[in-house]
Amino acid sequence: MMQLSNDSHCNKHSLLNVMNRFIAAANNMDETIMVPNLLRDVPLEDQESHASVSHNNNNNNEPSFPNKQRDMYEHYLLLKSIKNDMEWGLLKREMAGGASFLEMAVKQEELPQMKGEAVEEGPDLEGQFHYHLHGLFSVLSKLTVQADHLTNRYKREIGGGSLLR
């Protein structure tokens, strides 16, 4: 049986630590935002200007993708949904009848075979693992920043009363 060292819990660059930071930020967001409906119709413009600055400072030259959410409420729901998927896994989504990420991945794997294209005989599993691990670190770090930003903006806007109608 493989034993984990205690250092893995302390390593700030571990996947578990990055996941825990996002979940903590999402929990803080959820505890702070007592009335999520106040976020309806509040534009993401403040966050988009913040995101464009962070994308310009990005050392990885990663492409920036526009947000699909129309307002802060939809962004809040997205972050909360991702947190729930991480905590409860994909089984809950599958039981609800929605297409799971696993099903989508299997369908993507089957596409080249259906088109008659040759699928690589010996996939580089280690390379794929590191590629996706890097992606997880990147996405979870960005989601953590977004959850913190949404929480702080909610506090600022509610404190000023600008979201109250």
UniProtKB/Swiss-Prot annotation:
Function as written in the Swiss-Prot or TrEMBL entry: Involved in stabilization of microtubules. May play a role in the regulation of lipogenesis.
One GO BP: regulation of lipid biosynthetic process
Record flagged with keyword Cytoplasm: yes
Name the record gives this protein: Mid1-interacting protein 1-like
This protein's encoding gene: mid1ip1l
Protein localization: Nucleus; Cytoplasm; Cytoplasm, Cytoskeleton
Sequence segments annotated as region (Disordered): 46-67
Keyword Nucleus: yes
One term under GO cellular component: microtubule
Family: Belongs to the SPOT14 family.
Organism: Danio rerio (Zebrafish)
Keyword list, A-Z: Cytoplasm, Cytoskeleton, Microtubule, Nucleus
Pfam families linked to this entry: Spot_14
Domain of life: Eukaryota
